[in-house]
Amino acid sequence: MQMNYTKWLDSSFLEKKEKEIIFELSEKEKNECFSGYLEFGTGGMRGIMGLGTNRMNKYIIRKATQGLSNYLIKTCGETGKNKGVVISFDCRNNSSDFALETALVLCANGIKTYLLSSLRSTPELSFAVRELKCQAGVMITASHNPKEYNGYKVYWKDGGQLVEPEASGIVSEVNNVDEFLDVKIISKEEAISSGLLNILNDELDEKYLSYVKNESVLNISKKDFKLVYSPLHGTGGRPVKKLLNDLGYSVFVPKAQEFPDGNFPTCSYANPEEKNVFDLSIKLADEVGAEVCIANDPDADRTGMMVKYKGEWIYLNGNQIGILLLDYILKNSKNIPKNSAIASTIVSTPMLDFIAEDNNLKIFRTLTGFKYIGEKIREFEEGKYNNSFLFGMEESIGYLKGTYVRDKDGILGAMLLTEMSCYYKGIGLSLIHI
């Protein structure tokens, strides 16, 4: 700990005010902030924001990005540098700053870089990697963790999270980087004038949403159906409202949770797996006469819901939602290929196996983590198996239909859950009946 602390206190790279903050740390705080380095694992890194080697800050972001740059250049050469990296970020405090730091290190290494100008969801980042044909992508997010946290997730050229061999390769490179001496960085002005930094505004938004819309199962009547949706202060608000309004749904949003806010003032733990995050939604639903509440986590890759039945609000867990979605897709989709397959994690419900067997579908079980479902989709496309991807899910409220992204998509999830709820209401049923 002391070596790391002294290194930072004596470093010429730190600003005067940063050194003052470090100098004032208590012994306990020194240990917490400087005991080792924030771990960059096979899925990236996530931690409490603050100064120190064991905290999320611009210096540790630079270290991670230099390691990513080194790996990309070593393994992909000029081709990888020209294909480049796309960067997005969520609503969290410092996310936009961390995204810019990431971009400036990539550009300093001669890597073409696309930076989203404002916050976007994690699934749209996955889409952007594929649409722009980039070598990699970076998402600045800590998902549903408390407000003190932020994170850094790396995606590879197929739009999926890192798997082997890239995962271990990048981890090794990051671990070999000194956060001060080994990092290359240039100014934003230099990055733009060099032609390496490309700022993206809304160029991808409509195309992404069009792919989501294409995964709709039925064109149904929306008459008399009302929905309450909450982005929980996150990135889902704008795209989900636009998507559902375009499709003709009557959507109500709790005003206190409608707009991005990294302090998450109404829910300290913005996780749609927790019933209490629906409190404001339920209050609004009772006022407007809605019987379904749907919520995304802050980076909008996961989707939770509650349903009103006989006057009570009932929470549906990830396994229940996944089974309902799969059943709805199988019963109402036309022309499902005979070689269709389902992919899910080993910890998700065994009921999927029975549904697959009843419908003559192949099911593939993966290790825990949606990145392995994304890897399975790639293997289908490469011909490793004679199957095509139909649906993927994990019990932690993550779902995917289609192959336009390679990660769970909470915006798609919101659309499908809305559509499914509306369909069953139209035939006189609640999801609780199914």
Summary of predicted features, one role per range:
Residues 4-102, 109, 191, 197-227, ...:
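An N-terminal, well-structured beta->alpha segment
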Residues 29-38, 150-277, 284-285:
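Gly/Ser/Thr-enriched, mixed-charge loops and adjacent short helices
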Residues 34-54, 143, 231-239, 298, ...:
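Conserved phosphate/anionic-ligand binding catalytic regions in large, soluble enzymes, centered on
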Residues 78, 86-149, 245, 250-305:
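N-terminal small/polar loop signature for handling phosphorylated ligands or for N-terminal nucleophile
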Residues 117, 177-200, 309-391, 399-401:
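Proline/glycine-rich low-complexity loops and linkers
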Residues 124-182, 298, 309, 395:
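Active-site phosphate-binding/coordination module
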Residues 397, 406-430:
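Mobile "lid/hinge" segments at catalytic clefts and subdomain interfaces of large enzymes
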Residues 432-434:
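Conserved small/polar residues in nucleotide/adenosyl-binding loops
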